[in-house]
Amino acid sequence: MAAFSVHILGCGSALPTTHHHPSSQVIDLRDKLYMIDCGEGVQRQFRHEKLHFGRLIHIFISHLHGDHCFGLPGFISTLGLLGRTGTLHVHGPEGIERFLSPILEQFCHRMPYQVEIHTIDASRHALVHEDKSVKVYSIPLSHRIPAVGYLFEEKCRARHLNKAAAEFYNIPLAEYPLIIEGSDYTTPDGRIIPNRHLTTPGTPPRRYAYCSDTEFCPSIVPIIQGVDLLYHEATFMEEDWARAKETFHSTAKEAAEIARQAGAKRLLIGHYSGRYKDVQGLLEEAQSVFKPTIAANERMRIDL
């Protein structure tokens, strides 16, 4: 099975601390890298993780609060210094172009590569990117400004060819792609061979959902139903529930409740408030509702 892993580059929130970096993650799927959010200092974290800059083609920004996007100017500049030539695609909600275009014009106008900016409607659940390896869907979140989560779903073959059966029926190689996609096969004498006799079920696609920043938002549950791993912000503990509501963030308990309702296989919490020196309390609070919870930490890698 191809690699599908999530690297945590930063899991802190807006206030800088000595414990955590601002939000950023990298998904490694079939030798391609996809970044989600780009907090300050992300280049250093990228090197710590021994990730290859050239394998990154797409960056997905959740919203335009600084702890999620202030790393973009430096990261984009670094790619230019490294001699990048391939286009970099930056996806984000309304305002991403107003934020990034003046910076590119002022500081990055002589770079050896292009940056393409793609604006996402944060109010809609939609397919926002597709390539040979993955489909990426937007997840409408509820925050103080437009915010969007992302659902990554790997692309798998719908069916696996039973080569012994294909050879038995003398099926031409040219017919294999259609059979793998689910078609029956008609022999030269007109006999129909059902697809189920020629294939076996495909591997279910692995799915990863990133939901930050957001207040408690049950409307996302149908979108993320059954995901293999859910990252959900857990900025506060329940004892600070009033502050969570005031700032449109979630508590660890609320993050766990979303995971429970969605039937997620595992929950990864992060985006910790700087008021907590130790995240153990957040982890225990989440685990009291949803046992398979992991507390994110820098340089952590989670395999799906």
UniProtKB/Swiss-Prot annotation:
Q: What is its EC number?
A: 3.1.26.11
Q: Which Gene3D superfamilies match?
A: Ribonuclease Z/Hydroxyacylglutathione hydrolase-like
Residues reported to bind Zn(2+) 1? H63, H65, H143, D213
List, separated by semicolons, the cofactors it needs. Zn(2+)
Cite the cofactor comment. Answer: Binds 2 Zn(2+) ions.
Q: Give the family from UniProt.
A: Belongs to the RNase Z family.
What's the protein called, per UniProt? Ribonuclease Z
**Species name for this entry?**
Porphyromonas gingivalis (strain ATCC 33277 / DSM 20709 / CIP 103683 / JCM 12257 / NCTC 11834 / 2561)
